[in-house]
Amino acid sequence: FGKKKASIYTTTDSSGNYQLKNLRKDTYRVYALKEQSSDKIYQQATDEVGFLKDSVVLDQNKTNVNLEVFKEDASIFRVVDRKLNSDGSLLMSLNQKLRKPVVAIIEPAALDAAKLVKFNSTNDSLRIWLKDLTFDSVKVSINDEGKALDTIKFSRGKKDTYTRNIVASDNLEGEFLNPNKPLRLTFNLPIESVDLGGRRIIKKKIPRTGITITRDSLDFLTYVVRYPWVAKRKYEISFADGAFTGILASKNKAFNKSFTLNSRDNYGTLSLKVQTAEKGKQYILQVVNENEHIVSSSTFQNDTTLKFTNYKAGKYFVRVIYDHNKNGKWDTGNIKLRVYPEKVYNEAKELSIKANWDRNETITIPKEPGTI
């Protein structure tokens, strides 16, 4: 499978239904492809695939031979994109989600100690900042779980120049700051120092003092702003030119952050009593909002009670992953290993949270589909 076109094949209609007629009595392997091209050959990099674990013994007409397609993880590691950005950082996109990645500058080796590396949340993209850009070329090694994966070379021209514009995003909820969270500023490049003299807080047009700005211990691109904010008050923080000094002596241009501290009464609590039909199995329960963004994730094996506090009023939903291999995340399927993607149960009940209200619910996770 995957090396040549199948000798027997058909296509589905718009609803996914298919038929194969006039087959002789025999034993068959059945696969499904959702192709990007039309070559009828499985291309792991681009196509989705489905399969039946067991062969079909065709000795009479068969109905309801159903397959679900999925996207496999790449079996062979590859860097699918790389570039030297206009700010001098190195960017790489990978075709695999790494588990325990380690990145090193091997040439010039002197650049390795001061490098800064930031992976995205799924470990399939990374950016590297170097504190010296006088090199002609640089080699980067990528390892995962102690295994060498690849070495990538970046080259630059001697006359190349770079522009660094410091930009700060935030965690505001529209015009409001969640009273249960500090104000967080996340920058597009590493910040090396903060000048607290280059800022002021305006509340009713009166400059204020007492603010602290510290680097987040888990994310070097993020700074936490703390101040004794008062609920329902409007604030504006003004940062002057050069308040933040970034890597390679870059400076920010003046910017403001305006918001009102929301009231705690606008948030609620959801308590879930979770009952499992199969003891000893591991589950991952995710709470998602209307946009299907995961706002919380919990892992457990037996009946439990989960409490989600200080949630913004709105509609929420629950989905549960049957975590077969107990690694704390959803895993796709694998044709070679004859493994299906991990099943997901979507709770039909909408779990709305109202302002200043505690909601108690019970959900029962059914047996995993396909188990006896």
Regions found by a protein language model. Name each.
Residues F1-I372:
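N-terminal targeting or signal-anchor segments and their processing/structural boundaries
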